[in-house]
UniProtKB/Swiss-Prot annotation:
Bias-annotated ranges (Basic residues): 163-176
Subunit field text: Heterotrimeric transcription factor composed of three components, NF-YA, NF-YB and NF-YC. NF-YB and NF-YC must interact and dimerize for NF-YA association and DNA binding.
Keywords: Activator, DNA-binding, Nucleus, Transcription, Transcription regulation
Polar residues composition bias: residue spans: 58-74, 188-203, 414-423, 438-456, 464-477
A GO cellular component annotation in the UniProt record: nucleus
Source species of the chain: Dictyostelium discoideum (Social amoeba)
The keyword Ubl conjugation is assigned to this record: no
Name of the protein described by the UniProt record: Nuclear transcription factor Y subunit gamma
Primary location class: nucleus
Amino acid sequence: MENQIHSLLHFPSSASTGSTSNSHNNHHNNNNNNNYNNNNNNNINNINNNHHHHHNYKSIQQHSPHSSTPNISTENVDIYSSHEANSSNGYNNGNNFSYSMNGNFNYNFSPMNSPHHSHNHPDTSNNNMLPLNDSGIHFNQHQHPSSASSSSSSSSSSLSSSSHHHHSNHHHHHPNLHINLPPIPQYPSLNDSSSNGNGTPALSSPSSTTPHPTTPHPTTPTSTPNQRFQSNGSSSFQNQLQNHLENKLSSFWSSQLRDIHKTEDFKTHELPLARIKKIMKSDKDVNKISSEAPILFAKACEILILEMTHRSWVHTEMNKRRTLQRTDIINSLSRCETFDFLIDMLPRDEIKPSRKYLDELSKAQVITPEYLQYLQLQQMATENQQKNNQNNQNNQNKNNQQILPQQRNLNIPHSPQLQEQSSNNNNNNNNNNNNNNSVSVKRSYSMEIQNSSPLSTPKKRSNSQDYNFQYNENNHNQSSLSQTQQLQQLNQQQQQQQQQQQQQQQQQQQQQQQHSQQISQQIHHIPTPSNSSSSLPPLPPHNSNHAHNNNNNNNNNNNNNNNNNLNNNNNNNNNNNNNNNNNNNNNNNNNNNNNNNNNNNNNNNNNNNNNNNNNNNNNNNNNNNNNNNNNNNNNNNTFDYSFNDSKNDEHKVSLNESNFISTPTNDNIISSSPSSQVYYYSDN
């Protein structure tokens, strides 16, 4: 009675003798699970119908080699799906099998990612057993492991408790079965509205045999940086491109699936089957090929070509072109992981973003990080160029400042032209006041006058010119001075030089005045010449010394001329020397004197062109007396004496006095000329 009451409590709608006896036997057989029969299967189905339990049982059987794998059906048969509730969200995301009426099941479209596969319990009319485990024992995933191993409870109570346990827990209390397995994806559940009144799940119509996917078959990943079209680019443009590509691919796959289900005639194909069969036979291990195999390959090749064309055409439209090029195919395949098997065939050098894409980004004023980096690099380059230019200019200025103090205005004079003895060396360079005096040139002229006999011809004089170049270098002082300081120093030096020159001129003028005074005093003691045969009165004894002093003054004046000093008295001395030297011939020829006068006048004219301050009174009245005195007192009554100390003790007196009367020549007088008024006499 206890067993019958127990069975009535748990099986109210299916109380029969067969069920009670079977449950009683199962209760007393210590839970012997190997003795299941068809009656137990009926009891299980009755329990499911009474409790309206409509759930997809799942097995943890992973199709091991010990278990028999189910037959895969590719035929168009009536099947019912377990994802009718989520038909609005697209096809099932899980990797499920759906059993057909004949016991077969079909794969869904997406590949298997999880080892758990849901299946529906078939109808009781087929008398199909539930899936068995490796030992042949029925194993239910929804049953707790402890309930399967309990020996005190009966099979009916364990089955009923498992059914109630399913509604309460919904397989959340089985962590031991999922330790080493990946996470289970969310499977769809059937609603109450999808079941009939008998509790059996509703069958789908024949038109819903093939689910229509709403997402494309292969998706284009954008996770890997090497396969992105523009890494960290414009998100809006990238999203638009991705959505456009997904829409095209989804419509493509949906149309292809419709065409596949509608095809009934397999006689016409886009690709030649003979060519495909020939390619298949290129493998030596393949002996025979059925007629259906090339059809599958032909369709697969057709779909592959069409999908690649759709992907590449998006790139052609993006580049604003109407012709599909090889680069478009390469870029489209490199952006999708499903075509990684073709990665070795693609030239990686041609994978680059197009210019039109960058142009669109610039027109849309979308600033990407790459473009910002590019602008920063350009700014850095321009700044570096400006810095380099500034540094170069600074270095050049420094070098110029260092070189300018070291520059020396070396005015090396030209080699002087050797002139004849009759030419006057009147180098009064008054225009060279601004020249630097870093180079000082000293010229010393030594003039040797030979004693001439009365009948001897004049000999050429020998000139010796000595050039002593003295370079005054003060590099350590000048390098520390700036340009302005140098100019100031130069001006100061020039002023000092001018002052020195003025002092020298004043000294010379004083000397000349003294000399003229001495000569004027001596002239008063000279008597007038007479017609007698007596010679001229002797000159004072200091005249010889006076001649030597005149020669010394001439040498000093020549040295001062080369130092850019204004020595105008040098002309007189040089003229006197020339007259003295040329008039020692002791001849009665007046032409010699005239030639000397012409030479002297030419030289003096050249000097007058360069020296505007010379107050030269050139008496060209065939007179040898070129009194180019720079004194303001140009007296015609002055007498210039030039004495030549020689063995013959010949003296020359040049008289400019107009009242002087020339006397005829005597034996004692060497030569006389009224025009020149020069007298030669000897102290005999």
